[in-house]
Amino acid sequence: MPGYDYIYLGDNARSPYGTRSFEVVYRFTRQAVETLFNEGCQLVILACNTASAKALRTIQQRDLPQWDPARRVLGVIRPTVELMDKISKSKHVGILGTNGTITSGSYSLEIKKMFPHMTVTGEACPMWVPLVENNEFASPGADYFVRKHLEHILATDPEIDTLVLGCTHYPLLIEKIKTCLPAGITLFSQGEYVAASLVDYLHRHPEMDARLTKQGSCRFLTTESAAKFSDAASVFLSHPVEVEQISID
């Protein structure tokens, strides 16, 4: 969707969220959403599985009606879950995520709600985000931690045929993950499916689409060092970006 205007806010000063409590994740996420609303955003996507798991519902139900009922805050878990029954043939799915995402049980609850016949196994991978954040995703340490968690989840449920990368950092480890997986296992990365779900959402809600500006601009905001964020973003995007440092607490 390149024609739309985007503001990306990375709360890098307080990341990772994965090990933090529900209350702290909610507070941080609420502050971030309010900041984006103050910047003029009409629709905010929580492009973080931990924030989607621990803060989305409270923000939607408690905060949004007070801020502006016409605006929307959406997450990344439901668009992922909706596809699981089509992708998994064995109906045994594994979720790779942060401690926060896995302990919240959000994936398991959502999958069981939609597809009661499916079996869901979660695996917390607490070192994966720091490896990516520190640009060590090609290191021997990454080899060790990737193999360790994949072996553990597949030993826990040998019938798993689909593994979900339940964190937006994890695609940078995807090639390393693929080398550790046995044949016959589908690796599910969220990005393109969440984007497709957003396109579908805007088609079904033309009133929201009409509220979105469409000049093709993109701003990047961070709560930490702009230079450090720019270096990390260039790894994800394969090109340099201009970044603004802000405070949201």
Segments and roles (model prediction):
Residues 1-249:
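Non-catalytic structural scaffold of enzyme domains
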